Amino acid sequence: MALLVGIVVGLVDPLIQPLVDQLTDTKADYSGYGPLLGNLPAAMTLVAGAWLSAAVGEELVFRAFLMHQLHALFALVPGRIYFASLTGGLVFGLMHANQGLSGIVVTGLVGALFGFAYLRSGRNLWSLVLAHGLIDTWGVMTLYLGWY
């Protein structure tokens, strides 16, 4: 499951994000991170903060807590793992509304995948914390280097 998550997440930046940008006729809005361009101390500070607040914090809230609750809520629904994963992904995407429509869609898709992986893996949070941290590290570095 961790390998599948890694492969899919690895495709987000080069394939999925541009496709969603084209389909929504928008681009994810990272304008609030403009000061990172060429600013290594700021980028490294944000990476450290992202590992604590997003990788660990968001995975605890959105996977360990929310997915547990949603899975229980859909207890009588056939295919509840899918409903819980999609609902969790929707909530996760909407929590990233500051990124615009494209950002909501991509983040929601990743959130649904992470929720599904969490439930299917016997609720193993650590591979998702690692994946989330790597995604955020890559994102900060692309902003620092001016690639996005």
Place the predicted regions along the sequence by residue.
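Aromatic-enriched alpha-helical transmembrane segments of multi-pass intramembrane proteins
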Residues: 36-41, 78-87, 123, 138, ...
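Membrane-interface helix caps and helix-loop-helix hairpins in membrane proteins
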Residues: 94-102
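Hydrophobic alpha-helical transmembrane segments
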Residues: 3, 44-48, 82-87, 104-105, ...
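Juxtamembrane helix-loop-helix connectors linking adjacent transmembrane helices
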Residues: 1-54, 72-77
